[in-house]
Structure formats: structure tokens, C-alpha cells
Amino acid sequence: MLFDQIASNKRKTWILLLVFFLLLALVGYAVGYLFIRSGLGGLVIALIIGFIYALSMIFQSTEIVMSMNGAREVDEQTAPDLYHVVEDMALVAQIPMPRVFIIDDPALNAFATGSNPQNAAVAATSGLLAIMNREELEAVMGHEVSHIRNYDIRISTIAVALASAITMLSSMAGRMMWWGGAGRRRSDDDRDGNGLEIIMLVVSLLAIVLAPLAATLVQLAISRQREFLADASSVELTRNPQGMINALDKLDNSKPMSRHVDDASSALYINDPKKGGGFQKLFYTHPPISERIERLKHM
């Protein structure tokens, strides 16, 4: 059951990443069609930009993300309990010991980042360390170590980069349209254009406007799939499903983080740091904790 869930979530995540690349290609084609009279040229440029974004994030993610979240690095002397739990989980998972950080925040949360198991780090809030017992802390760190072992950290980083590239291209196109770039380039075509030309123009405009929203939803879907996988993988490491269930229950009752968490980092956390209601639920970076608990109960 556990390995079936892991395999299923991995397949779904790669499908979602493919959708990301298709969205990037669509925006690139639309921008190229509108502004340089070459949809294919725009597509190629967009894919190159996405590749550059992904590479830059992969090689710089750890320092950038930890700095953005106000995390401070600790060691065996300054945070022995957390350090030893992470060390134990890394040993069981057969990965190198990740760097360990603490975020001074009363909310209960944690995340992992990095480009690969050899260059990874985990962070936990001070609130989590104050509330969780040993078994629950092991479950949470097992969850984060699983993100590292399963290369979720790399996939999440690529997703952030591609979403940023799509948003950047759409924003650039919007500014160009504001200054009349598309109108000047296609004014003659539109004056005598046929139905197909008008349809292509409308579709291109819709792609530019809607692609960032679609990219956000795909990024959230990737995060949600990886959370299910990491929950299951944590149980595999600890052999203690009840510990994970108890930890999730405490996370569910935690308040939002007091410090500002940017959208790119939100998807990394074990618990959505920006809790809200109503329409905001559509943009939650995580599946409902009640659903995560139910899946664990039926493993």
C-alpha cells in the first residue's frame, strides 16, 4: 500500500511538471505571436528562460530560502534535541546529514530545501520544538528528510522557477501591450485579417492573462502530491504512523506563522503557513490535514 502510494504520487508529479512546461511553452508562443510575429521563436525563448531560471534556483536555493524565512543555522551544541532527531532520520533514510536551521516563530512548522541530498537543509520553528514530543518531532523530521531523499526539494525548486518564468513573461507582455507594442505590430494584419487571425489574437491574449493563474494552481497541485508522499515516507522511516497522525493533529491546531512568508516559500512547509478561509482555500499549498490523517489511517 505504501509503495503503491509513493509510485502513484511520483507519476502524478511528473505529469504536473509536464503541464508546467506546456504552460510555459504556450505563454512563449503567445508572446512571440503577438510581438515578434513568430510563435515558434517565442516558444524557444520561453523554454530557454525557464531553463535558466530553474538552474539558478537549483544552485542557490538553500541560502536564498533560509534567508527569506529568517532561519538561523544551529548545530549539535546549540540545538541538540533537534540535531539528533534529524541525524537519526537521515541515518535511517541513508542520506547525508542535512544542515539544520531554526526559525523563531511560535507557530508549528518545518520545511526542507536544497538541490539534492548532498546539499540540503531542514528548518523547524521554535514553536514546533516547544510543543512536539520526541515521537512527533521524529515524524515531522522524517517527513522533511523524506522530501530530501525523494528529491522533492529539487522538484519544488523547479516548480517555483517555472512559475516565476511564466509570471515574468506574462508581466512583460502586459507592459508591452500597455505601451501598444502588439497593436502597432498587428494593426495592419487585424484591419484586413480573417477569422483565424482574430481567433489566434484572442487565444494569445487569453493565454498571457490566464497562464500565471494556471501556473499557480499547478504549483499547488505539485506541492499537495508531495505532501501525501512525504507523510507516507515518514511512516516508512519511523515505523510509527500514530506519531505522524499526532503530529499532524497538532499542526492542524496551530495558528498561522507570525512572520510574513512569501508565496514561493509557502509550498515548502509541512503545514500551510498562510491559513485562511473561503476563496483562499483554492490556493492552499497543502491538502487538508484531515485528509492527510485519513490516508495515514488507511495505510
Swiss-Prot record:
CDD domains per record: M48B_Htpx_like (cd07340)
EC number annotated for this UniProt entry: 3.4.24.-
Compartments reported by the entry: Cell membrane
Domain of life: Bacteria
Gene Ontology MF terms: metalloendopeptidase activity; zinc ion binding
Name of the protein in its database record: Protease HtpX homolog
Residue stretches spanning the membrane: 15-35, 39-59, 158-178, 198-218
Primary location: membrane
Membrane topology designation: Multi-pass membrane protein
A Pfam family per the record: Peptidase_M48
Keywords of the record: Cell membrane, Hydrolase, Membrane, Metal-binding, Metalloprotease, Protease, Transmembrane, Transmembrane helix, Zinc
InterPro entries xrefs: HtpX_protease, Pept_M48_protease_HtpX, Peptidase_M48
Name of the coding gene: htpX
Gene Ontology BP annotations: proteolysis
Cofactor binding summary note: Binds 1 zinc ion per subunit.
Residues bound to Zn(2+): H143, H147, E227
Principal EC category: hydrolase
Family under the similarity heading: Belongs to the peptidase M48B family.
One of the record's GO cellular component terms: plasma membrane
Cofactor(s) required for function per UniProt: Zn(2+)
PANTHER family assigned to the protein according to its UniProt record, in alphabetical order: PROTEASE HTPX
Active site (catalytic residues): E144
Disulphide bridges, residue numbers: none
